[in-house]
Amino acid sequence: ARAYIATDPHYQSKYYAGGYPDDGLGVCTDVIWQALQAAGYDLKALVDADIAACPEAYPHITTPDPNIDFRRVNTLDTFFRRHAQVLTCDLSDGQQWQPGDIVVFGDRVHIGLCSDRRNRQGIPFLIHHGNPIDEAVERNDIPRMTVTGHFRWLG
């Protein structure tokens, strides 16, 4: 995730043939697939296979599109609820929040990754790419947003 934010991508939601941004632009979901790719997982292939195997789990997708489905927060929220460990959204116990955990915010509008850095209360910093700030950052943002999903990918 840090390698992705180090490229200083600009925030822009855009459709890509093949699915992967290649022009220095990106969105919050790119942090997630990039981090999983660095760990040896092909999130795009996993999401595409799950949509094909269980389309009813993804009612927001009327026609699957492998070029974009894995880059939508609501799709990733559904995928991680089905295939990752679902954890607490309560921030009161910082030890429940570990580096690499995936966090969804609001009405499935934003997603990021927990850092190994923590604030004074023990809550991890968030590695994410946000709009309208147009920044890919690692900072103390989790407490400022409404957490609606918290997942741990176990592979």
Q: Can you name each region flagged by the protein language model?
A:
Residues Y4-S13, G19, H110-L113, I133-D134, ...:
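Proteins with a high burden of low-complexity, intrinsically disordered sequence enriched in S/T/G/P/A and R
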Residues A52-P132:
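...with weaker cross-activation on analogous glycine-rich loops/strands in unrelated enzymes
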Residues G122-D134, E138-G155:
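Low-complexity, Gly/Ser/Thr/Pro-rich intrinsically disordered linker/tail segments
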Residues L43-K44, C114, T146-V147:
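A structural signal for short, hydrophobic beta-strand segments that form beta-sheets
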